[in-house]
Amino acid sequence: MIQRRNFIKTGIAGTTSMALGSILPASCKSETSSNAAQKIKVDLPRPITAMTEEYLGIKPLNLYGGYEEMMQKMRSYRPLDLNAVEWRKANPNKDYSEWARQARERLLSGLHYNLPPVNLQAQTLETVETDSFIREKIEFNSTPWFRVPGYFYIPKNVPLPAPALIVMHAWGGPMLFGADRICGEPVHPAIVNHRAETSSGRPLADWYASKGYAVIVIDAFHFGNRAPRGINGLPNSYDPSKLDNDTHLDYESRANGALHYGIRELNWAGTTWAGINYGDDSRCVDYLLSRKEVDDNRIGCTGLSGGGWRTNMIAALEPRVKATVTVGWMTTSDSQQAYNVNGAVNTFCMLPGVWDRIDIPDMISMASPKACMVVSGTEDILFPPVGKMEAARQISETYLWAGNPTLFRNYTPAKPHCYDQEIQEEALIWFNKHLKK
């Protein structure tokens, strides 16, 4: 009879070897069982760049201590390199459309979120009318398990159907508020402060509606009316607009503390945070197409920070959107991992098996022929200068390869992490050029 200790040494090891042998690439497999115990040498298809302060253009914020070298090696070994620039070098006889198809399939499959058919069952709950627009408080089904709250704007004084924008709130800021951050009169001092810091005090959705756009804004998962309740010390029911400052800060801390729990729950359920966000955002297009006030062929998308990330996803994967403006979320994966993961990369970015195959700029690169503008403030310290510059270079090169060099713009104002009045005006020019012609 096999002793338990020997079984652990031989049985499990042998089983593990067989299992790994069936999934590892040929370069990682040992040739014979006699050298199975020898150290496996992995060829790294990409050279490892030393992510120094000089290279990054800024001092790294959170190097992973003794694990840093291991992380860089892990990133350098690409099981499948679908970065546009690298793929083109390796496949000189293939065209842009083939790369974009493969990259898009990888990104979409990595979301692990298949949207089932659903009846939106949209409702308008209340209406506010101004001189420039009508704002409706709405809700609709994005899936059989999510009913999404938000706002829809009908512009006045313009011919209908009008062009439309999906406007996305940021990740950073008061988590107990989502769409309300950028819609309507501020319902809490936290919103006043957030707007002052990010949008020159303007409610962004109201402003775009006043410029002649139909607009939809929703609460992202874990924000606003979808913020945590009944967990981590949060009550089952509360109205964030009625919280005093101390209670609001306490609830904000508790909601943020539930993030790690949420990502584990979602992954265990077989999906990703990014998948839920993209699913909800894609359903916003369905909602827009259900409205007679919207021109189906003139839909755009924009957002700051986490909203900029979601805009990247829409640019990459949603064919019904024709123009985008990403504000405050563009870099390269390698430089970001070395510089600042903790401050910029959150649950909405987590896609195992994706970012070691494609890169962040590839989301915009695969969007051609959409008209895409990326805004990267030179004073935005969430991202390293080299990451922002290299991302723009890759996207420009890929749009040229796709035959649409004029449909990409990289705008680099001397701004911090914001979507202020100057950026708003530049974004409006971009949307007017591509959605109002």
Spans of features found by a protein language model:
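N-terminal export signals
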Residues: 6-27
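C-terminal segment of N-terminal export signals and the immediately downstream linker at the start
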Residues: 22-60
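Non-catalytic accessory segments flanking enzyme active sites
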Residues: 74-153
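Proline/glycine-enriched tight loop/beta-turn segments at coil->beta junctions
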Residues: 145-147, 156-164
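Cap/lid segment of the alpha/beta-hydrolase catalytic domain
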Residues: 168-279, 335-338
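Mobile cap/lid helix-loop segments that gate and shape the active-site cleft of serine hydrolases
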Residues: 257-271, 280-284, 322-364, 369, ...
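Alpha/beta-hydrolase fold nucleophile elbow
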Residues: 294-303
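C-terminal catalytic histidine-bearing segment of alpha/beta-hydrolase fold enzymes
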Residues: 393-394, 398-437
